[in-house]
């Protein structure tokens, strides 16, 4: 049988196309393998980040593509069409990291009641979280709109949760306020929601076109457009969480706040405008926030299940807000996926939209 795959040129993300890839049919699957139909997946600016840093973080290794091309990984759902693993049945629903494709063959390993892992050799260079699949058949929190929100936000909100935890653990480095760039992005407003609950002042930076949306979220104490950052009073200690990855903006903020910039953390690349050779800046040295480090630290300190318990509570508290913040927009078929991809790449998707896609017509 064939899988329809959406591929991009790794060093020119504007160039994309759909190809057909031959997969083994149900009878020809190797031992313990699963043939999975990718039913739907979320697509956000975060997936563009996966593509931008695909070489460095080995994301391109997850789903092989023709030379020079890559398949962008996405969070979504799959249905097991056929199984050669004795503990996994056809018809099961899986949630995890899938290719932008209609089908995937998984080499099922470490199968438990709650999940399984893809043991394919080419997938083992990335963090284990990217090879894990949750078995979610019959779980209402993974169905319908709840499932869409999980695909759109759960991985991003985990990053929000970890940054919030890191900043609070370090007493915000003495800052009295936290500034977030790309304030309309899902990771940013998830973090703003958590910070706001802690009572620290949160300032969101955004473009003029997104001011109304960011203000409507209710989790930013102040919303400032990028051309007005110099008007922010510079006299008190400030922490900056950079979701945009924009070198010019980062330099402007550091020079404006000077020694009062007590923390400068780089998290995202929504603007994709970073320069490799950046000047030494006043204030705290910009550092990348590396989520796995915080996960390892807290797993050791909090013990088994400690992270899941705390994150689960934060997610449960967030979910009631999401229908007011996001409209889920479903698009199906190769042409619709291509349009959604290019719109996201060019920043044309309204911030209040969450795209749920399928390559199947």
Regions found by a protein language model. Name each.
Residues 12-40, 45:
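A short N-terminal beta-strand-loop micro-motif at the entrance of redox/enzyme domains
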Residues 29-41, 55-105, 110:
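Glycine-rich beta-strand-centered segment in the early N-terminal region that forms part
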Residues 97-176:
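NAD(P)H dinucleotide-binding glycine-rich loop of Rossmann-like/cofactor-binding domains
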Residues 163, 194-197:
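Extended repeat-based interaction scaffolds and adjacent low-complexity, acidic/S/T/P-biased segments
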Residues 188-189:
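N-terminal Rossmann-fold NAD(P) dinucleotide-binding loop
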Residues 196-250:
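Adenosine-nucleotide cofactor-binding segment
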Residues 252-317:
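Glycine-rich phosphate-binding loop and adjacent beta-alpha segment
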Residues 296-361:
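C-terminal hydrophobic helical "lid"/dimerization subdomain
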